[in-house]
């Protein structure tokens, strides 16, 4: 994050021949809407709370999600996301990222692909985003699914250069994106994703914390 003209000049001096885009930082809560589209219409599947790393050079890096996201602006987000997705010409699943300001949701970007929230969306609604994707590409959109529970996921990152000795597949289904035993990770590299579910957001996050504690015993 560049805070003044001096910092921008210093940053530009590091990459003198590389063009860059300067964007204003929007303060608020990071969120997203998962949609599926058929090229001219779209359906919102889920509203997600996004978890960011929060410090250092990776402060704005994605590190997990909670689905569903119960927020007073959820309805506005859904309406905007469906309009954007329908107008994009995309077919299949796509995500629209938001930052929720004090009074309004700000659209940040459109991701025309399977999103990082796919795990929590599928766990929360009991649906298959892949099947929704296939059907949408054939022209058929689903009804908006009912949320069956809350789902939370967090990515664990290496706190130093390390080699993972453990076979984490034994911890499934609370882990995903499972690396091979013996994989080398540089500091700050993503190692594995950990999930938790519950009847409420608080319960899902509590389960996630317990599962992370269990997984950390094998990640050292």
Regions found by a protein language model. Name each.
Residues 1-7, 200:
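Alpha-helix N-cap recognition
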Residues 16, 27-31, 89-94, 150:
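Short, basic and Ser/Thr-rich N-terminal targeting/leader segments
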Residues 32-34, 95-99, 184:
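Short, surface-exposed charged micro-motifs
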Residues 37-42, 100-104, 158-160, 199:
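Short acidic-glycine loop/turn motifs at beta-strand connectors
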Residues 90-102, 145:
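A short glycine-rich, hydrophobically flanked beta-strand micro-motif that places a catalytic Asp/Glu
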Residues 131-220:
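Peripheral (often C-terminal) accessory segments that flank ATP-dependent C-N-forming ligase machineries
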């Amino acid at each position: 994050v560049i805070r003044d003209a001096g910092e921008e000049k210093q940053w530009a001096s590091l990459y003198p021949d590389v063009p860059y885009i300067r964007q204003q930082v929007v303060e608020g809560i990071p969120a997203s809407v998962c949609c599926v589209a058929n090229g001219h219409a779209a359906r919102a599947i889920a509203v997600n709370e996004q978890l960011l790393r929060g410090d250092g050079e990776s402060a704005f890096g994605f590190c997990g999600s909670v689905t569903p996201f119960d927020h007073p602006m959820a309805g506005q987000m859904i309406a905007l996301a469906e309009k954007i997705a329908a107008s994009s010409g995309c077919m299949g699943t796509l995500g629209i990222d938001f930052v929720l300001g004090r009074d309004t949701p700000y659209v940040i970007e459109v991701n025309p692909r399977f999103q990082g929230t796919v795990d929590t969306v599928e766990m929360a609604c009991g649906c298959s985003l892949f099947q929704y994707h296939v059907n949408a590409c054939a022209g058929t959109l689903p009804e908006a699914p009912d949320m069956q529970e809350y789902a939370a996921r967090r990515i664990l990152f290496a706190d130093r250069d390390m080699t993972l000795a453990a076979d984490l597949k034994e911890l499934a289904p609370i882990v995903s994106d499972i690396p091979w035993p013996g994989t080398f990770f540089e500091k700050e590299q993503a190692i594995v994703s950990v999930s938790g579910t519950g009847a409420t957001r608080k319960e899902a996050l509590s389960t996630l914390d317990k599962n992370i504690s269990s997984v950390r015993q094998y990640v050292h």
